[in-house]
């Protein structure tokens, strides 16, 4: 009964002030629902966030790290992985249904949800029509921890196949630092030059790091 009464506090706070009023600890407690033996759910949530440093660290952790917290088992690990996947799918659906793109912020949020936590570099392309409405998005290339080989002609082939007029490029840095490398800049230039011959416009290249991202367009590089 103690766990249920502890959970009621963030729940009542949410109902009165809205979900955004909850702290990270309170929000996590809502999802966990129960604590462990001798530890109420709010205390458990606080301990978990302290152990992983942030919600990002918690939701992208592997089971070996997760199980190191005393009293935490596979059920709670599955719950939290489910939350992360729900968020990813939510942005996936939102991207399709809210075209054209509402803002650069929404684009970055979507890409962050898709590429955060990947252990290898993934190169992704969002394909848009002449009105900059999303046609589809695709993970075209997969690499290693610090490199992904990208072939501009394959990007162009896919764009022609679906009659795209514009592209947004994106890839992640598993290291966590979103600052573009020299290689990132060079491949972007190659893609832009290749696309110009086919009357395709590259709107941006966004590099995703751990809780941060860098836009080539905002830097004035495109």
From Swiss-Prot:
Organism: Shigella boydii serotype 18 (strain CDC 3083-94 / BS512)
GO molecular function per UniProt: metal ion binding; metallopeptidase activity
Sorted UniProt keywords: Hydrolase, Metal-binding, Metalloprotease, Protease, Zinc
Xref: InterPro entries: MPN (IPR037518), RadC_JAB (IPR025657), RuvA_2-like (IPR010994), UPF0758 (IPR001405), UPF0758_CS (IPR020891), UPF0758_N (IPR046778), UPF0758_YicR (IPR022820)
HAMAP family linked to this entry: UPF0758_YicR
Entry's family note: Belongs to the UPF0758 family. YicR subfamily.
Entry keyword Acyltransferase: no
Name of the protein this chain belongs to: UPF0758 protein YicR
């Amino acid at each position: 009964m103690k766990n249920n009464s502890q959970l009621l506090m963030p729940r009542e706070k949410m109902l009165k002030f809205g979900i955004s009023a909850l702290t990270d600890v309170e929000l996590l407690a809502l999802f966990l629902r129960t604590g462990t033996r001798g530890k109420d759910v709010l205390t458990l949530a606080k301990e978990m966030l302290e152990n992983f440093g942030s919600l990002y660290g918690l939701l992208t952790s592997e089971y070996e790290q997760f199980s190191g917290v005393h009293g935490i088992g596979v059920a709670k690990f599955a719950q939290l992985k489910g939350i992360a996947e729900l968020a990813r799918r939510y942005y996936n659906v939102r991207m399709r249904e809210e075209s054209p793109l509402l803002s650069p912020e929404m684009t970055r949020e979507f890409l962050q949800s898709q590429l955060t936590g990947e252990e290898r570099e993934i190169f992704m392309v969002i394909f848009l029509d002449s009105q900059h409405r999303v046609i589809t998005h695709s993970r075209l290339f997969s690499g290693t921890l610090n490199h992904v080989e990208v072939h501009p002609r394959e990007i162009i082939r896919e764009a022609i196949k679906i009659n795209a007029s514009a592209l947004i490029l994106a890839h992640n840095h598993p290291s966590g630092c979103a600052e573009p490398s020299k290689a990132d800049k060079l491949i972007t230039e190659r893609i832009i030059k290749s696309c110009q011959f086919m009357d395709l416009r590259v709107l941006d290249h966004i590099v995703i790091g751990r809780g941060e991202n860098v836009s080539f367009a905002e830097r004035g590089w495109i």
